[in-house]
Amino acid sequence: MTSPESADVPFLLRPAQPADLPVLERFAAASAYGITTLPPDSAVLAERLQRSASAFATEDAASGEEIYLFVVEDVASGAVVGTSGIAASAGFADRFYCYRNEYVVHASPPLGASNRTHTLHLCHDLTGVTLLTSFYVEPAYERTLAPQLLSRGRLLFIAQFAERFSDRIGAESPGLADDSGRCPFWDAVGRRYFDMDYPSVERLAVGRSRSFIADLMPPSPIYVPLLPEEAQWSIGQLHPVGELPFSILVDEGMDPDTYVDIFDGGPTAHARVAQLKTVAASREIVVAGIAESASHRARGWQLAASARRADFRAVLLPGHARGRSLELGAQAARLLGVQVGDTLRLAPAPVATQATAGDRHD
């Protein structure tokens, strides 16, 4: 049995509730263009919070239309400092469109000439995959452990309740766009067929099937060398706000190079759920005891999540559990809502940054 961890549990991941609407409104107002799952629309956010609460609470079999929204709290202050989400099935009501990167070879043997050309193909390969969505963390918390818990903690939820999700997973990251909403990729490709600017088409896409894209976009491949140089360069590039969550997903083992977003050209990463680092390393463990205080400060961090869906909780604990049981500190047990004999799901937290529990730097 592993001895109790330090009492310093910095953050708590929990399901978002309707009462969290004001803070989500603030996050949505501060988020970048391209994050359509966190729109600056109070009515849409309220509806998503209600759908999420229903998804966590229902005893019905999964239908695929569920969304799950999480928030992370600073334990010391009780403040909500970030959010993330899961969509059980991309394109639940219709197809989920993106561009697939391919290379076409044209050759003339008599001339001894050949060309390998980058092309983009409109596809719906990722229809039905589980999507990671809605990531946002307060700038002051970007260098703390909060982003790690926000991103990787929801993977423990997927691992624990695998029957409610696809065996494939994807994540869209925002592409390049400036503060005014100008997007080089959209201006070069989509605007030629939609006659609207990038912010307008993003607003149009909120809560709507993307089938209208197939109705208006040509099905033939886009030859990338024919695009303006700025648009070519932007394909697969990230908006700066996407770099932190993107780096965590790539560290998890997601492939960021095959697909790009149909609107802004940002990378759409994908993977098999079972191959994700956190999922593959996760295991169930029994709470063997609860101690009032910890004996020492352990090195490293591990993710720990409760095994209940309706009141799911996840935290980062110092140290690495060994064996099949764990003695928790009283603070961690209280935050997770567990007692002796309850089951937790644990996974190592491969924190690749210099983040610590106490840093609060911009």
Predicted region positions:
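A short beta-loop-alpha structural element at the N-terminal edge
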Residues: 12-24, 37
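Active-site rim helix/loop that mediates acceptor-substrate recognition in acyltransferases
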Residues: 37-81, 85-98
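Extended, composition-driven regions rather than compact fold-specific motifs
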Residues: 65-71, 80-81, 86, 91-95, ...
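Conserved acyl-donor/pantetheine-binding loop and adjacent beta-alpha core of acyl/acetyltransferases
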Residues: 88-134, 199-207
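Conserved acetyl-CoA-binding loop-helix of GNAT-fold acetyltransferases
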Residues: 119, 137, 142-158
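Short beta-strand-centered segments at strand-helix junctions
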Residues: 316-341
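A generic structural signal for residues embedded in beta-strands
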Residues: 344-346
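Short, Lys/Arg- and Gly-enriched loop/turn segments at beta-strand edges
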Residues: 351-361
